[in-house]
Regions:
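N-terminal alpha/beta PP-like core and its mobile active-site loop of ThDP/TPP-dependent enzymes
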Residues: 1-266, 296
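Active-site diphosphate/adenylate-binding microenvironment
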Residues: 5-9, 13-18, 23-26, 270-330
């Protein structure tokens, strides 16, 4: 006989889950939710028949889980249905754009006999932006107004960035990235996309002359904190905001449709040339640390930027470095 835990592991392996780790905290789950990272979060609980006694460590796990896993929270009710629950949770986690799916696993469901591994469940296939949306945005671009494309989420990967760079080369739109992208591919040979500044005063300057802002898997920018006498919403009052593609849609297909609509499909994208900032000298400063990273980093480096204000110059200093991935705060 196979118990619930054994059948669960077989289901996870068959679904392509390759990394499992034990974790007692929740802060990274908050980051995963904000970053739209596909995570299956399995939380142990008391045996189903023990819950009614309200033991010392009993808690309402579903309520706590919804804070970081609003799209999918489920408590497994039996060993026989556990693996189907798990397969559906994995599909939910993988649904575009990605989310934390929480499966609560009571002890007796885990140790009970009769577990049956389940086949993987395919997540829904994302759809591109509809024709009416694409045509409305194409018309806005053709108007000649100062236009910026604000990119976020999964749009900051090479295929979508190249598509956006074609649009920029053809139509003169400005490319901007959200302040703290989950992951952005950068470096020589890729389009350079300027990140929106962390400080609201600087972000406001970047957006000052923008008359039309097109959102690509991104939200309209707001300040990180409220300040007396200053606006929280950073988009200029006279700027029109258009959403090309929402996080749960097909980003690349939507950008390609827009390029077709404005005639940018064959445009040659502008790419970042290779350039190192030079080896820093003198007294150690945050800027010189950023410069050293840009000078010495090898190809395919993964930068995990937790410097916040100390890393303000990091994007500039690494722009022409060999190709790399940058992961930021979410």
């Amino acid at each position: 006989m196979t118990n619930g835990a054994q059948a669960l592991m077989k289901t996870l392996v068959d679904a392509g889950v390759e990394v499992c780790f034990s974790n007692p905290g929740t802060s990274e789950m908050h980051n995963a939710r904000k970053g739209k990272v596909p995570v299956l979060n399995i939380v142990g609980d008391h045996a189903t028949y023990h819950v009614k006694y309200d033991a010392q460590l009993q808690s309402d796990i579903e309520t706590v889980a919804r804070n970081v896993s609003p799209g999918f929270v489920r408590t497994a009710k039996s060993t026989e249905t556990l693996c189907q629950d798990a397969a559906e949770a994995i599909a939910a986690a993988r649904s575009a754009p990605g989310q934390v799916a929480t499966l609560i696993l009571p002890a007796d469901v885990s140790w009970g006999e009769g577990g049956v591994p389940s086949a993987p469940v395919a997540p829904p296939t994302p759809e591109p932006a509809d024709d009416a949306t694409v045509e409305a945005i194409a018309k806005a671009i053709r108007s000649g107004k100062k236009t910026a494309l604000l990119m976020g989420g999964h749009s900051l990967r090479e295929p979508s960035m190249l598509a956006a760079a074609k649009l920029a080369a053809h139509s003169g739109v400005t490319l901007l990235a959200e302040t703290f992208p989950t992951r952005i591919q950068r470096g020589a040979g890729l389009p350079y996309i300027e990140r929106l500044a962390y400080l609201a005063e600087l972000a406001t300057v970047q957006l000052t002359d923008v008359e039309q802002l097109i959102l690509v898997d991104a939200k309209a920018p707001v300040s990180f904190f409220a300040y007396p006498g200053k606006k929280s919403y950073l988009v200029p009052d006279t700027c029109q905001v258009h959403t090309l593609v929402a996080p749960d849609q097909d980003i690349l297909a939507s950008l390609n449709k827009l390029n077709d609509a404005v005639g940018a499909s064959q445009a040659k994208p502008k790419l970042q040339p290779a350039k190192r900032p030079g080896r820093p000298r003198g007294k150690l400063t945050a800027e010189k640390v950023c410069k050293a990273v840009g000078e010495l980093m090898p190809e395919n480096t993964i930068i995990v930027d937790e410097g916040i204000t100390s890393s303000l110059m990091l994007s500039v200093m690494t722009a022409g470095a060999p190709r790399h991935d940058m992961i930021t705060l979410t």
